[in-house]
Amino acid sequence: MPITETDEEPRVAYKHPMPVEALPEIVVPDALSEGDDRLWVPQAKNVYFRPLCLNVSQGYWMNLLKVTKSGVLSRHRHPNAVHGFVLKGCWHYLEHDWVAEQGSYVYEPPGETHTLVVPDDVDEMITYFQVNGVMYYVDPDGTHLGYEDVFTKIEMCKKHFEKVGLGADYVKQFIR
């Protein structure tokens, strides 16, 4: 429903408490900062992610995906929708004829299987992704090779943050 009344005090903060059951917001200052490599979790050779929100109650994760060398990332299938926004560099899927360049928004529909490639002339790619559900890694014939979901992402974060001295609990700030 559109707003039908005029707010006479638009710069006055809401005066009532938030619901007791509401979880706190997440604010990640300077999320694109390259100043601390410990914040980037290794996922594969030359592939890293920076967690922003790991939602265990709804089964999705939001992260920055960084690739520091050209090449094939992975072939995978999504049973749920994925949203992406390219912040740096570019990439494409072998199965499609478009290229996601810096500033591009990408919607991947449920059921999509694709092979992500960073072109040879790209030194670094960073994309903001929201992945809902799970990613199934497959071979060219669709044979299951592995999977990732919000819980495997959390475990990867715990191990990495412990190893680099931030402590396994560092990941808790991103979990909702």
What are these regions (language model features)?
Residues N63, K69, N80, V106-Y107, ...:
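Beta-strand-enriched cores of mature, soluble protein domains
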Residues F49-P51, M62-L64, H83, Y105-Y107, ...:
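Conserved hydrophobic/aromatic beta-strand scaffold that supports enzyme active sites
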Residues K66-T68, H76-Y93, Q130-N132:
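Short, conserved beta-strand element in jelly-roll/cupin
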Residues W91-T115:
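Short acidic-glycine-tyrosine-enriched beta hairpin
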Residues P51-Q58, G71, R77-A81:
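Active-site region of the double-stranded beta-helix
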Residues N63-L65, L73-H78, E95-W98, V117-P119:
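Short histidine-centered beta-strand/loop micro-motifs
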Residues M1-G59, K159-R176:
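A short, N-terminal "cap"/entry segment at the start of jelly-roll beta-barrel domains
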Residues D121-R176:
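Double-stranded beta-helix
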